């Protein structure tokens, strides 16, 4: 990357990024660098001098994108520049993540390193598929076929090189990149895979079949997922966001895209150091007790789920569906690094309190929430 003339900013939707933006715009003004941002994001920052442009223009003009937030913001930034050589600098504003390279206090030093070309660029693989409605989607973490409560298990056939290998019956079947191997795939028992490896990982969450092992495939091998006749209706999640549904008989061709995004690294910490810290591989005692003031539950209505936040980062969620004036609580998922901390109970309590405040009847198909209601019958509608 030569001298940067235009920098694009992508911001966390809720977190205060004002100090980071001021540091970047100050650095840019000294060098005659133009700073661009998305209209809805920069408009909420007081005295922001970044120029508001639409995403397509920002991606075309920027020689560097800076992601200010956590892993979710970083994934969104990577999807914006998918297939381009534009490098992405991840600045962590909140709890430790895997993808961001620097924390906010080190931003000034990082900008100086970019000035002096003291960095490397790491390629990241994406995974792509075409949805049943014809839309092509991409993910840098994973694409998952997830059971819809009330519609039966996810019965999915795995075909490699055109031949059937195994049929899974599970709550979800996940195809992840090495980047995503520490996300949903990890919580399903999948392996941790170095981002330097070009591979796809297939894992089953809560498998009900006799075969429950993960598969690691080379990116040159053809992979397809077939929704079997015995399957229920499945949600198609792309980096954790529901993008569509698959009925029995549907087939998803999964295609890897090596080198789909370029991430800036300064060599301060390795992938394995970040993994050790976030996943608490030395045991839960290392993590310490959670301060109740650090735990926040929010209603992420656009994703149809309640999210529990630790230091502003999503540590778990409770998916729901609102239908005919009722709230149906579907299933919970908690980050493996924070299992055993009572976060699922906090989600259930917050969801039920929210329903009471709205005088909304509640039903639950999530086994955990059903058990919570049995223990706390005063919350049941």
Kindly label every feature range from the protein language model:
Residues 353-381:
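C-terminal structural segments of small proteins and small subunits
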Residues 304-315:
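Conserved beta-hairpin
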Residues 153, 163, 167-171, 175-211:
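Gly/Ser/Thr-rich active-site loops/lids in small-molecule metabolic enzymes
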Residues 132, 145, 150, 161-164, ...:
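ATP/nucleoside-binding phosphotransfer catalytic cores, i.e., glycine-rich phosphate-binding loops
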Residues 340-353:
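Conserved acetyl-CoA-binding loop-helix of GNAT-fold acetyltransferases
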Residues 96-172:
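Catalytic core of DAGKc-family lipid kinases
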Residues 1-64, 105-120, 131-137:
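ATP/NTP phosphate-donor binding region
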Residues 332-339:
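A short, internal acetyl-CoA/4′-phosphopantetheine-binding micro-motif in the GNAT/acyltransferase core
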């Amino acid at each position: 990357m030569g001298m940067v003339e235009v920098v694009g900013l992508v911001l966390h939707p809720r977190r205060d990024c004002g100090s980071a933006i001021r540091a970047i715009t100050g650095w840019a003004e000294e060098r005659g660098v133009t700073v661009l941002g998305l209209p809805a994001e920069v408009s909420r920052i007081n005295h922001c001098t970044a120029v508001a442009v639409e995403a397509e223009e920002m991606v075309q003009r920027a020689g560097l994108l800076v992601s200010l937030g956590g892993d979710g913001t970083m994934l969104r930034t990577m999807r914006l520049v998918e297939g381009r050589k534009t490098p992405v600098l991840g600045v962590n504003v909140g709890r430790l993540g895997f993808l961001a390279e620097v924390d906010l206090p080190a931003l000034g030093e990082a900008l100086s390193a970019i000035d002096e070309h003291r960095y490397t660029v790491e390629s990241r693989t994406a995974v792509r598929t075409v949805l049943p409605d014809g839309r092509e989607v991409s993910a840098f973490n994973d694409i998952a076929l997830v059971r819809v409560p009330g519609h039966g298990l996810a019965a999915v056939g795995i075909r490699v090189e055109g031949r059937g290998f195994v049929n899974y019956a599970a709550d979800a079947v996940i195809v992840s990149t090495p980047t995503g191997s520490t996300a949903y795939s990890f919580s399903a028992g999948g392996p941790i895979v170095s981002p330097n490896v070009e591979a796809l990982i297939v894992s089953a969450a809560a498998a009900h079949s006799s075969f429950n092992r993960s598969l690691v495939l080379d990116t040159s091998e053809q992979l397809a997922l077939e929704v079997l006749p015995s399957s229920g209706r499945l949600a198609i999640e792309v980096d954790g966001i529901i993008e569509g549904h698959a009925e029995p008989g549907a087939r998803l061709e999964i295609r890897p895209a090596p080198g789909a995004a370029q991430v800036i690294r300064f060599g301060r910490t390795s992938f394995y150091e970040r993994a050790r810290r976030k996943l608490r591989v030395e045991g839960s005692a290392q993590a310490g007790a959670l301060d109740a003031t650090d735990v926040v539950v929010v209603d992420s209505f656009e994703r149809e789920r309640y999210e529990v936040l630790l230091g502003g980062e999503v540590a778990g969620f409770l998916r729901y569906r609102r239908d005919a004036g009722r709230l149906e609580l579907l299933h919970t998922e908690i980050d493996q690094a924070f299992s055993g901390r009572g976060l699922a109970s906090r989600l259930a309590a917050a969801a039920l309190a929210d329903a009471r405040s709205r005088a909304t009847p509640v039903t639950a198909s999530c086994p955990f929430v059903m058990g919570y209601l049995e223990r706390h019958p005063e919350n049941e509608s």
